[in-house]
Amino acid sequence: MAPEHAHYNGSKKIRSLREDKLASGAKARSRYGEACFQRGRVIKEARGQHTALRAGKDYETNLRRKREFRVPLELEPGRLRVQETTPSLDSAGTDDQDSENAESDGDLPIEVICDLEVIPQDVDEQELQRLRRENDRSSSPAGANEGIDDEEAGEEKVSFPSPQHSKHSHGPTGSEQEHFQRVSCVRHSYMQKLKLPQPLLAEELLERTLKYFPLVEKILSGQHPSMYYDHARSAFKRSRRAVLSIDEFRRLDLSLFTAGYYGVRRQMRVAVEVLHHYRDLIARQNNRVLRWWGVSDFAQYVLAPELLSALCQEEMNLPTLEDAWDVMEATTEFGLLVADDGPLEEWEVPAHLARLEAAGHSSNLREDPSNDKR
């Protein structure tokens, strides 16, 4: 073969190899470009799904915030649109999201666009005030609230008091006079039949009850009898639940768990002191009755009235604790109506005496339990 032909064939092979390399590189670049394009499309779709999900979750929050910032609403036939005065929460994000928000032109992310019907109302505030004044003048005491709901009637009384209500604003109402009359009758009746001691104020009550606090440990260990624990155990046995529910509590006869003539307020005050000293001890107990009631309720409805029963035995010089239980069961009405109505703290005494005087019971102040200074 001639040298020139050999050189020509060699050059041809080199060009073929170069073209093959260029073709393979082009194919690789093509595959790489296609892969980048696919990846970009996947990322864009993921961003779109994330934006739609976030818009769905934050729609209510965005709408509420737009209302709070008083964003003006523009109503068009069949669509609800917003005039963008401030950047919304959905507008923050990437450039793709910004472009999508720009194309939406302020449309709220509502999946179903409903037709809205706007009924304009022209209400003058002065006209409303004039109508209210006319209604007040024309209303009679017998039918002042006819055709008005209870809630609206209450607002009307507060905003526009009638002369009939303001006439007796500085004196006791008839219902308050009847209440004090009933309290006086109940107090006088129990004092005559049982000669009950006058209810103690909180400071002296705790001072005299403190010496009976060791009974808490004895009651928890079963070494001391307790009428209130027997009642609590009976309620537990009637239940099918692991703990005392609200419905079961409402069905309980709470008169069985009330500390007689001491009343509920003093009973709760003693229970707070019991929890202050014995909460950890009570919580460590494995007693099923106690766990069904719970620590706080067990202290209030079992331990506190039991300690006050011991104090009752001392105050009334009763021979046995059973006698004190009988007194506690028989004087529940006195405790709820008389003792709970009177003052518990020292600073409540002047206000209570002022109420009695305003109700016309100043002559009975010496008989009032709260007036005893001890």
Curated annotation (Swiss-Prot):
Keywords: Cytoplasm, Nucleus. Its main location: cytoplasm. The keyword Cytoplasm applies. Residues 1-31, 75-106, 129-180 are annotated as: Disordered. GO terms for cellular component: cytoplasm; nucleus. The keyword NADP does not apply. It holds the Pfam family RTC4. It comes from the Eukaryota. It is found in: Cytoplasm; Nucleus. Coiled coil: none annotated. Residues 93-106 have a biased composition (Acidic residues). InterPro entries: RTC4 (IPR039024), RTC4_C (IPR028094). May be involved in a process influencing telomere capping. Belongs to the RTC4 family. This is Restriction of telomere capping protein 4. It comes from Lachancea thermotolerans (strain ATCC 56472 / CBS 6340 / NRRL Y-8284).
